A protein has these predicted regions:
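Short, glycine-/small-residue-rich phosphate/pyrophosphate-handling segment
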Residues: 38, 42-77, 98, 192-215
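Short Gly/Thr/Asp-enriched flexible loops that form oxyanion-binding sites at enzyme active sites
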Residues: 10-26, 98-100, 163-172
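Active-site rim loops that border cofactor/substrate pockets in soluble metabolic enzymes
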Residues: 89-150
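Short, small-residue-biased leader/transition segments that mark boundaries at the very start
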Residues: 1-6
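C-terminal functional extensions of proteins
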Residues: 150, 157-158, 162-165, 171-215
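Glycine-rich beta-alpha junction loops
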Residues: 8, 54, 88-93, 124-128, ...
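Short, acidic/small-residue loops that bind anionic groups at enzyme active sites
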Residues: 17-53, 119-121, 172-189
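Flexible, glycine/charged-enriched surface loops at secondary-structure junctions
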Residues: 78-84, 113-123, 210-215
Length: 215
């Protein structure tokens, strides 16, 4: 069986069609999602961002699957109980802002055991998710605020913008995968650097190896 899939110059749609084929495909989980790993200069830990490329406007159930997929990658890089922050514009639930409602529901899902292997926090703005000092200044009581290992995006626009901001403005090194298949799928952009492509292969191998340990 395949341990990882790399698209090279093949069109992304062709790769995904093959992965999702009901008879010969590699689909494993309920949903395929994109997970990006960043090493940001000056930041004290690796950071995972999901989903910046696959899930356009995920609903609550899709977000649960996106978290489960991201946890598998987090485990592969050594984060055994990652903190997953549900990113929003504010820190309080506002019915007019659906992402905050979903965030609260995802926190409850983790507390009830529906989502396992991680701690889910939110709703949180980006600064309070990754900076302890910012969380303290805002008076956020959650002890995990500022300690996020995984950033859950409310939609693809937010994820895409954050991905490019980290790479272009912050000079981050990155790797990315499609997760949720029987093997991690490497779908990099033709604009990505050679180092990003190499990083993605290494991350795919680590994720596949961790999956093998758990099977």
């Amino acid at each position: 069986a395949a341990s990882d899939v790399y698209k090279r110059q093949v069109d992304t749609a062709i790769i995904l069609k093959a992965v999702l084929d009901k008879d010969i495909g590699l689909r494993d989980a309920k949903l395929l999602s994109h997970v990006a790993l960043f090493e940001v200069p000056g930041f004290d830990r690796l950071l995972l961002v999901t989903d910046a490329a696959m899930s356009i406007a995920p609903d609550l159930e899709a977000k649960k699957e996106i978290i489960r997929n991201a946890v598998k990658v987090a485990n592969a890089i050594g984060a055994e109980n990652p903190v997953v922050a549900c990113l929003c514009a504010i820190e309080k639930v506002n019915p007019k802002m659906p992402a905050t409602v979903d965030a609260a529901a995802l926190v409850d899902a983790a507390k009830s055991g529906e989502i396992t292997g991680c701690t889910v926090i939110g709703p949180l703005a980006l600064d309070n998710a990754i900076s302890v000092e910012a969380a303290k200044r805002k008076g956020i009581a959650d002890p995990n605020a500022g300690h996020a290992d995984v950033l859950l995006m409310p939609n693809i626009e937010t994820g895409n913008a954050l991905y490019k901001a980290l790479v272009i403005l912050a000079g981050a090194s990155t790797a990315s995968l499609i997760v949720g298949a029987k093997a991690p799928v490497i779908i990099t952009s033709r604009a990505d650097s050679e180092q990003t492509k190499i990083n993605s292969i290494v991350l795919a191998l680590a994720t596949a190896a961790k999956k093998g340990e758990n099977n």
